[in-house]
Amino acid sequence: FSPLRLFARAPADLDVMSAHVQDAVLQTGDMTFLDDKRRFVLVMNRFCWELPQKESLRVRSALQIGGILEAKRRNIRSDKPDSVLSLLAVRFAPNDQPGDALAGTVSIIFSGGGEIRLAVEACEAILEDITEPWPATRRPAHDANA
C-alpha cells in the first residue's frame, strides 16, 4: 500500500480524484468550511480502488477544496452530525462568464440526493490518505445497468 496524495488543478485532474473517492463513506460532522481560509475539508473512509481487485481495503482520507467563494448544501442536515453519507462523485463545472475561465462550481454528490456546491475561483483540490488502511468488509458493487 502506498498512500495517495493527489492534486487537482484542472477539471480532468478532479475527474481522476473523483474516481478515487467514489463509494467513500463519512458522517455529516466530518465536513467543515473554514471560512477564514476559504477552504472546504471533508474526512472520509475511502475505498482503495487503485489496488488490485483481490485487495479490498479502506483508508481514512482528507479532501480539501480551496479558493471557495460560496458554499451551499442540499439534502444534507447539519443538525445530524452522525448521519452517514456515501460519496458518489466530485465534479467541476466552469462558469460561462467571459474572462473567468478558471472559476466554476465544484459539486460533491452523495447518494440519496445530497450535494455540496462550492463556488470556486479555480479548480484546486488535494486528496490525501491520512491513516494506514484496514480490510474492507466488502467491495462496493455497482449495477452495470444503472
Q: Where is each model-derived feature located?
A:
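Long, hydrophobic N-terminal alpha-helical segment
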Residues: 1-41
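Intrinsic, low-complexity N-terminal interaction/targeting segments
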Residues: 11-25, 70-108, 122-128
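Short, structured motif recognition centered on aromatic/hydrophobic residues
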Residues: 33, 38-44, 106-110, 118
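A short, structural micro-pattern
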Residues: 36, 62-65, 84, 102
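Broad gene-expression machinery/nucleic-acid interaction feature
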Residues: 39, 60, 87, 103-105, ...
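A low-complexity, Ser/Thr/Gly/Pro-enriched, surface-exposed linker/loop concept
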Residues: 46-51, 55-80
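Mixed-charge, glycine-accented linear interaction segment located at domain edges/termini
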Residues: 107-146
